[in-house]
């Protein structure tokens, strides 16, 4: 229950909000690049945030706000490509679950002064921007993560990650779909207010 899934524009930014409906979640656009997401109930999967559509390799993305997860959650630059269908994450912070623990480690890269582990994994018959599909996920996971539980801010040089992925044979699709700073929750609870620039 809560805010129904939707996409659109607000304050000059693209937003995407998706929930499987199992958890109790409220997503609110605050104007500009800001959004607030509150979720509870420790069930279901949800992801929402603001950014751009289409995404771009050359973008430098800054974010600031508060991120207070309880349980499994990510705060990341999150997006999709088509041709090939790829879901990607540049994870800045996360809750109780390290997303790199369930993926295949490919290497590491230093971007914006921080080290990120690079991973990939396949998703089978899973939700995507094109309905239920089988597709690859690309991950950069900041190690160590930025501390959750309060104020958080940072800048992500997207090109740095995309180039590192390409150097490891991880090729994104040729057509970019959305690219947002997303808060994701899985069978957890929490709150986040994030402003993207």
Swiss-Prot record:
Q: Does the keyword Metal-binding apply?
A: no
GO MF? endo-1,4-beta-xylanase activity
Give me the disulphide-bonded residues.
Answer: 111-160
Please provide, in alphabetical order, the Gene Ontology terms of the cellular component aspect for this entry: extracellular region
Q: Where is the GH11 domain?
A: 1-197
Q: Give the catalysed reaction(s), semicolon-separated.
A: Endohydrolysis of (1->4)-beta-D-xylosidic linkages in xylans
Q: What are the subcellular locations of this protein? A: Secreted
Q: Look up the record and name the pathway of this protein.
A: Glycan degradation; xylan degradation
GO terms for biological process?
xylan catabolic process
Question: Entry's PROSITE patterns?
Answer: GH11_1, GH11_2, GH11_3
Highest rank taxon of the organism: Eukaryota
Is the keyword Disulfide bond assigned to this protein? yes
Keyword terms: Carbohydrate metabolism, Disulfide bond, Glycosidase, Hydrolase, Polysaccharide degradation, Secreted, Xylan degradation
**Chief location of this protein?**
secreted
What pH-related activity note exists for this entry? Active over a very broad pH range.
Active site per the UniProt annotation = 87 (nucleophile), 184 (proton donor)
EC id? 3.2.1.8
Give the first-level EC class, as a single word. hydrolase
User: Which family is this protein grouped under?
Assistant: Belongs to the glycosyl hydrolase 11 (cellulase G) family.
Which purpose does this protein serve, as stated in its record?
Hydrolyzes xylans into xylobiose and xylose.
What name appears for this protein in its UniProt entry? Endo-1,4-beta-xylanase A
């Amino acid at each position: 229950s809560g805010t129904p899934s939707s996409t659109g524009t607000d304050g000059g930014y693209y937003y995407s909000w998706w929930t499987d409906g199992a958890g109790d979640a409220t997503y609110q656009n605050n104007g500009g690049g800001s959004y607030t997401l509150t979720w509870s109930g420790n069930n279901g999967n949800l992801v929402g945030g603001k950014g751009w559509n289409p995404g771009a390799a050359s973008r430098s993305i800054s974010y600031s706000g508060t991120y207070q997860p309880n349980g499994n959650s990510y705060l990341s630059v999150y997006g999709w490509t088509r041709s090939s269908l790829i879901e990607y994450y540049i994870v800045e912070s996360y809750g109780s679950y390290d997303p790199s623990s369930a993926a295949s480690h490919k290497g590491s890269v230093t971007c914006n002064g921080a080290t990120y582990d690079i991973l990939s994994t396949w998703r089978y018959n899973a939700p995507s921007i094109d309905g239920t599909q089988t597709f690859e996920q690309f991950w950069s996971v900041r190690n160590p993560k930025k501390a959750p539980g309060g104020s958080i801010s940072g800048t992500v040089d997207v090109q740095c990650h995309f180039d590192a992925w390409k150097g490891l044979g991880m090729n994104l699709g040729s057509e970019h779909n959305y690219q947002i700073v997303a808060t994701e929750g899985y069978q957890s609870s929490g709150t986040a207010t994030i402003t993207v620039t």
